[in-house]
Structures are given as C-alpha cells and as structure tokens.
Amino acid sequence: MRAILCNAFKGIEALGFTEVDEPRPAANEVLVDVHAASVSYMDYLMSCGGYQLRPALPYVPGTDAAGIVLACGDRVTRFRPGDRVSCGNWFGAFAERMVARESSVALLPVNVDFTVGSTILHTYLTAWYALIERARLQAGETVLVTGAAGAVGVSRPQRRNRRSR
C-alpha cells in the first residue's frame, strides 16, 4: 500500500511517498481504510524529532484519520467491518490503511464528513482535557481562548458552548 514514510528526524524534507506492507490489527485493534487524515503540530514535531515520543525509523507519520473499518482483532467488541470511524494512533495515519486500538476509535456519524472526522480525536479531546479535566470549567464561567485559529483553539469555544447548555 502507499504511504508517506519518515526516514530521518529532519521535518517534512525527510518525508516521501513509498510502498509499505499493510498493517495487521492486533487483538485489540481495528484496521481502517483511511479516507482522510489530518496534519497536526504534533505530527510536525514528531517528524523533526522534537516530540517526547520518537518512533523507530523509518515510520509512517500521522496521528488522526477517518475512514471505514476493514477488519477487527479478536478482542474488538465495539466495531465491525464497514463502520465509519474517526481514529487515532501515535503514527500511521498518512497511509492508505492504518491500525488503531479500539479505545482510540469512535464511530463517525454519516452526516460528518471524513475530513472533519479526521480532526476530531486529538484536537477536541485536547480541548476537553484542558477545559474540563485540568481547568475544571463549570457552567457560567468565562473562557478566554488565545490562539483560537488553531485546531485545538477552534474546538474550545465549541466545547464550551455545548457544555453550558
């Protein structure tokens, strides 16, 4: 299958298209036919070697994707082939197919486009974690979002509005 491969921690200059073996899902993983993958700052940092996690080289970058489940590991119970999903992994999304742990996969409603679905997990969950888990935001509190043009920043007001209803 075709994928983008990172051969050295030198940023986007070290990325290139190539053929790689299709991943196989472990017992707790799903194999996803990737219809869209998002690019995040974390992906960039990882390709430069500037993120706290450094995958073994070479590796297929990309943390978030959306697509259709092709196969499920033996212990997967929440998904089946044909399901539309949003999924995340530390790497592997910049390929035609990727694997993700069942716990890092969410069903994607039919009215949500794959391109939108590929941005949901890390950005929205980062915003959720910051506002709800860390800041312990309560209904009626005011939130100032700096850097609202980025993916996480855009998701914060949306999460805040939904939470206050």
Predicted regions and their residues:
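Residue-level recognition of beta-strand microenvironments
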Residues: 6, 23-25, 37, 72, ...
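N-terminal glycine-rich beta->alpha transition that marks the start or flank
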Residues: 11-12, 20-66
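Short, flexible surface segments
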Residues: 27, 78-81, 139
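NAD(P)H dinucleotide-binding glycine-rich loop of Rossmann-like/cofactor-binding domains
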Residues: 45, 84-147
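N-terminal Rossmann NAD(P)H-binding glycine-rich loop of SDR-like oxidoreductase domains
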Residues: 149, 157
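Residues forming the Rossmann-fold NAD(P)(H) cofactor-binding site
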Residues: 154
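Conserved S-adenosyl-L-methionine
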Residues: 161-165
